[in-house]
């Protein structure tokens, strides 16, 4: 259980680490438009993202896919930027948009998984039996994501319910900030 606990902790700490705020920004942008009463939709979004990053994390760790880390480091903020833009133009009542959002969470998870893989590969080294470590790391990532979602729900509740800020204004303001930060990140990481 020692290995499992270690990699679970590392996955959790990796996604909740402020130094790696790009993943935090993505989860924030992904669930920001949803009130806590729509927790099922958020759970589906986070699960789709987890499935995506789990697939590419495993494929990359097992050297089945190799993509330049400079491209991945560029594409990660692009996924954040697109998600923040979608928040600005989004209509919560349109189920077609929700299906698109689920699909984009899965697709963007594929990109983020390759970013996670660089970190995980550096810890694993040449160990041949890495299934347990891979599972533990993914579970840790998922737990960290759920903590971020809870924080978003709580902070949004404070601003929208207690401070009476209109939800659409809150979403627009925070998404605008996320857009600006991710644009700067993308420009700083241009791979060409």
What do these predicted ranges mean?
Residues 6, 57-74, 118-138, 147, ...:
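Interfacial helix-loop-helix junctions of multi-pass membrane proteins
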Residues 23, 53, 81, 112, ...:
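Divalent metal-coordination and catalytic microenvironments
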Residues 64-68, 91-96, 155-173:
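Membrane interface segments of multi-pass transport proteins and intramembrane proteases
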Residues 1-24, 93-97, 186-192:
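Histidine-/acidic- and/or cysteine-rich, low-complexity loops and terminal segments associated
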Residues 41-94:
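Membrane helix-loop-helix hairpins that form the core translocation module of multi-pass transporters
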Residues 10-60, 64:
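Juxtamembrane transmembrane-helix termini in multi-pass membrane transport proteins
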Residues 29, 171-189:
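Final/C-terminal transmembrane alpha-helix of multipass membrane proteins
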Residues 24-40, 63, 85-87, 123-124, ...:
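Membrane-interfacial alpha-helical segments at the cytosolic side of multi-pass membrane proteins
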């Amino acid at each position: 259980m020692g290995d499992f606990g270690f990699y679970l902790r590392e996955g959790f700490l990796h996604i909740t680490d402020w130094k790696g705020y790009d993943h935090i920004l993505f989860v924030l942008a992904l669930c920001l438009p949803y009130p806590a009463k729509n927790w099922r939709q958020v759970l589906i979004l986070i699960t789709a993202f987890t499935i995506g990053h789990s697939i590419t994390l495993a494929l990359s760790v097992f050297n089945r896919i190799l993509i330049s880390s400079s491209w991945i480091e560029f594409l990660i903020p692009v996924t954040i930027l697109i998600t923040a833009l979608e928040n600005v133009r989004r209509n919560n009542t349109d189920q077609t948009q929700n299906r698109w959002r689920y699909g984009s969470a899965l697709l963007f998870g594929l990109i983020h998984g390759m970013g996670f893989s660089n970190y995980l590969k550096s810890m694993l080294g040449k160990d041949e039996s890495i299934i347990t470590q891979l599972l533990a790391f993914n579970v840790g990532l998922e737990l960290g994501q759920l903590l971020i979602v809870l924080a978003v729900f709580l902070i949004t509740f404070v601003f929208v319910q207690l401070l009476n800020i209109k939800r659409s204004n809150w979403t627009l303001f925070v998404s605008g900030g996320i857009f600006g930060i991710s644009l700067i990140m993308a420009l700083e990481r241009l791979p060409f």
